[in-house]
């Protein structure tokens, strides 16, 4: 048993609190009168509180401060890479070994298991005097120790009190191995963020020193955690990000959907959380822009959407001579493959390699029928379900709508095609339809043969999903080379701004109306040889991801899209 030296403090209102033995050699005597910082008079009484030393089972998982998991062992395990082990001293004086699932630098790992845990972790950082907040915190701690010692065993026979520190906030009750990590966790309830970035014009604040350290790397560009895969050169700011990335190589999907009958699993808890909202219908993030009000299932999609209104593109390619800007980090991350020939992602079924995980996922869906989820695909599938439910609720039968099918997968990644351009190809590999890039830098291009083969209108859906662009039937003479203006048509039939379609051989001036494409962020919906292709761009996702979403929806059942035909077509 470990003795914790405490003094009871009887406040002037008759209540009792606890303070730790004074620091800096100062003695507190029985019956001594002290004055707290708020002017309250208190009286000192000596007490001793017994606290059980923490016990750990061999192989018990522990949570690191960056949120990743490790495992604790009494002795080193045979077959473990020495670089994945780290020796720590437990509170009882014994030595244990922390095993990380992936190798990380030991000097940058902050463990949830610490060598010494004292009440100073809960006191104010200023050692001089006692603040009212410190007395309250110490009172809570003393009652917590006494309470945890009386916690009964649960149904599995595991003593919950072994982890010692339980969150007292209503509806939470999470347990932690150290007082320090309980304190860090409680900041999620209080909103306290004591660690502030001192970079000019930043000022962001964080609940932990590790969070601040990871954030500073966004300013410095430091990425100390490198992927151990031989053909992969990626590096990351945190060990948690590296751990998530490694799962793209191993195929590990540890986070399962809790809904009965679903059975899907995911590489990260955040993707699972977004997926669960497709079951519940929750959309907690709402756009504050007047007349918009769109809701989103994830904070990432919400922030990316807001940048549509602000025009902000904060992510810049640092490769000399490039300088392209993007509204979201994932687009910049995927853009980097344009500057490298590395293809680190391998299909576990056929062995084909790809530069991007999204391209690999599209290949798996098309070639092998395997479904993988991303935040964006879950968002789009949810919206598709909502549209289908709304159509089913209509009393009158819906108008005839063309069926949608996917022509073919992207057969090959070509080095001369920018990463953000998705191409639909024929079986012989010849390009059939080229799609606009996410940043709008490349125009929509259709060959005369494609236009002649159109059996119905082509529709383009705006970012808001409320308007469609309709090209009239082939008798409108769109098969000729040049530029043709068509009109954006809203759901109620109101004509909005014109958009220019570029056919083969046309040269477009920088100040032409094709510039509107750069702001509309549209995806191409086309028909060819009687078969419809449908790709809708949602929430600033890339066209490649949009194709993934459409393919997944088609494989789950018949998917249709209602097209709006313009009366005049121009």
Swiss-Prot record:
Sequence repeat ranges, renumbered to this chain: 34-45, 62-73, 88-99
Residue ranges of the region described as 3 X 12 AA approximate repeats: 34-99
Location(s), subcellular: Nucleus
One Gene Ontology cellular component: nucleus
UniProt keywords, alphabetically: DNA-binding, Isopeptide bond, Metal-binding, Nucleus, Repeat, Transcription, Transcription regulation, Ubl conjugation, Zinc, Zinc-finger
Zinc fingers, C2H2-type class: 165-189, 195-219, 225-249, 255-279, 285-309, 315-339, 345-368
Entry keyword annotation includes rRNA-binding: no
Gene Ontology terms, MF aspect: DNA-binding transcription activator activity, RNA polymerase II-specific; DNA-binding transcription factor activity, RNA polymerase II-specific; RNA polymerase II cis-regulatory region sequence-specific DNA binding; sequence-specific DNA binding; sequence-specific double-stranded DNA binding; zinc ion binding
Expression sites (tissue/organ): Testis.
GO biological process, one term: regulation of transcription by RNA polymerase III
Keyword Transcription regulation: yes
Domain of life: Eukaryota
Residue ranges with Low complexity bias: 379-395
Glycyl lysine isopeptide (Lys-Gly) (interchain with G-Cter in SUMO2) crosslink location in chain: 24
Spans annotated as Disordered: 365-401
InterPro entries in the cross-refs: Znf_C2H2_sf (IPR036236), Znf_C2H2_type (IPR013087)
Function noted in UniProt: May be involved in transcriptional regulation.
PANTHER family, sorted: TRANSCRIPTIONAL REPRESSOR PROTEIN YY (PTHR14003), ZINC FINGER PROTEIN 143 (PTHR14003:SF23)
Protein family: Belongs to the krueppel C2H2-type zinc-finger protein family.
Record-given protein name: Zinc finger protein 76
Organism: Homo sapiens
Record gene name: ZNF76
